[in-house]
């Protein structure tokens, strides 16, 4: 199917409103309730150094990319049962695409 083209600025607003309470994106950023997301693309689930993940996250074994994030962000607990991420998800495809566009820019 492919991920729709997202808007980085809209994605940044979504991140600030819905994600920044638990996640940071900058290199060397601290882990909060959730892991720092720097270097997310191309990394396997449950692999951010120094963050305590659930076994479910560590054993999922997928690599984060646009497609896996697009599915995950719709309903995290359905995609990784047992994750400690409490976020219910983004149901609108365009919001997920915007957030992914922002994450691609901000986590490199």
Curated annotation (Swiss-Prot):
Pfam families: Cytochrom_C. Heme c binds at residues 19, 22-23, 85. It is found in: Mitochondrion intermembrane space. Transmembrane segments: none annotated. GO terms for cellular component: mitochondrial intermembrane space. Keywords: Electron transport, Heme, Iron, Metal-binding, Mitochondrion, Respiratory chain, Transport. Binds 1 heme c group covalently per subunit. GO terms for molecular function: electron transfer activity; heme binding; metal ion binding. Belongs to the cytochrome c family. Electron carrier protein. The oxidized form of the cytochrome c heme group can accept an electron from the heme group of the cytochrome c1 subunit of cytochrome reductase. Cytochrome c then transfers this electron to the cytochrome oxidase complex, the final protein carrier in the mitochondrial electron-transport chain. This is Cytochrome c. It comes from Schistocerca gregaria.
């Amino acid at each position: 199917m492919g991920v729709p083209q997202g808007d980085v600025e809209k994605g940044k607003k979504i991140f600030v409103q819905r994600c920044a309470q638990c996640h940071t994106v900058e290199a060397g950023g601290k882990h909060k309730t959730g892991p720092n997301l720097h270097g997310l693309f191309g990394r396997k689930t449950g692999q951010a150094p120094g963050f305590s993940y659930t076994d479910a996250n560590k054993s999922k074994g997928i690599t984060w990319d646009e497609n896996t994030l697009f599915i995950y962000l719709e309903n995290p607990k359905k995609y990784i049962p047992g994750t400690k991420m409490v976020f219910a998800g983004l149901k609108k495809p365009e919001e997920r695409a915007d957030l992914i566009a922002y994450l691609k820019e901000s986590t490199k």
